[in-house]
Regions:
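A short, charged/proline- and glycine-enriched loop
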Residues: 1-3, 38
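Glycine-rich phosphate- or other oxyanion-binding loops that anchor nucleotides, phosphorylated ligands
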Residues: 28-196
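N-terminal beta1-alpha1 ligand-phosphate binding loop
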Residues: 3-28
Length: 196
């Protein structure tokens, strides 16, 4: 069983991590997009609540153990008043537009990545009218956490988000997600190392 479980929604979020840790496609799990080595396992869920619900429970049932740590890595939209495009943030508080739950993650002094709140939304936000979202938004983290909490203590769930936009993108085809993750790979790996 693997101790480090990395979750991404998009293949472009996963690829720099796959390369960094020298992960290979797990042939034993052809029904899921899983990449692994003897120390790390990475699942690409797909975008949105339904995709996470369809993949993550199956995956965790197969690989979870009591020493597991789950790290969700991905892009997020950010409020221009509180975030900068390309910056990585450690999520300290998580809410959603569809669950009535709020998760407050335990912090340790060792985490030097800036901390911020995240709201999981149902659909892409391309206009933050009335400044509703004050920090970050994504489409998976609350669903991932809601499922993972059935297996892991909240202290064993970590979320890292890299700001890809200021909630103003209409055409996602020009966004270089791979580069955003790649430019933050050292911060990602340092958080994973802290939990070894």
């Amino acid at each position: 069983m693997v101790d480090k479980i990395i979750i991404t929604a998009l293949q472009d979020e996963a690829n720099p991590i796959i390369e960094f840790y020298n992960l290979t496609r797990d042939a034993k799990q052809p029904d899921l997009k899983v990449y692994a080595n003897n120390k790390y396992n990475l699942l690409v869920t797909g975008v949105g609540r339904k995709k996470v619900i369809d993949t993550l429970p199956i995956y965790l049932n197969r690989i979870y153990n009591s020493n597991s740590i789950l790290i969700n890595v991905g892009i997020a939209g950010g409020n221009p008043s509180s975030t900068k495009i390309g910056n990585i943030y450690y999520i300290e508080k998580l809410t959603s537009d569809f669950f009535k739950k709020e998760y407050v993650f335990p912090l340790t002094d060792n985490i030097i990545i800036p901390k911020i709140g995240l709201t999981t939304v149902e659909k892409n936000i391309n206009k933050n009218n009335n400044n509703i979202y004050k920090e970050l938004v994504d489409m998976e983290a609350a669903v991932i956490t809601d499922i993972a909490i059935k297996y892991l203590d909240l202290s064993k769930i970590k979320i890292l988000k890299i700001v890809s936009d200021h909630m103003n993108i209409m055409d996602w085809s020009n966004l270089n997600i791979r580069k955003l993750i790649q430019s933050n790979i050292e911060s990602i790996s340092s958080l994973i190392k802290l939990n070894e």
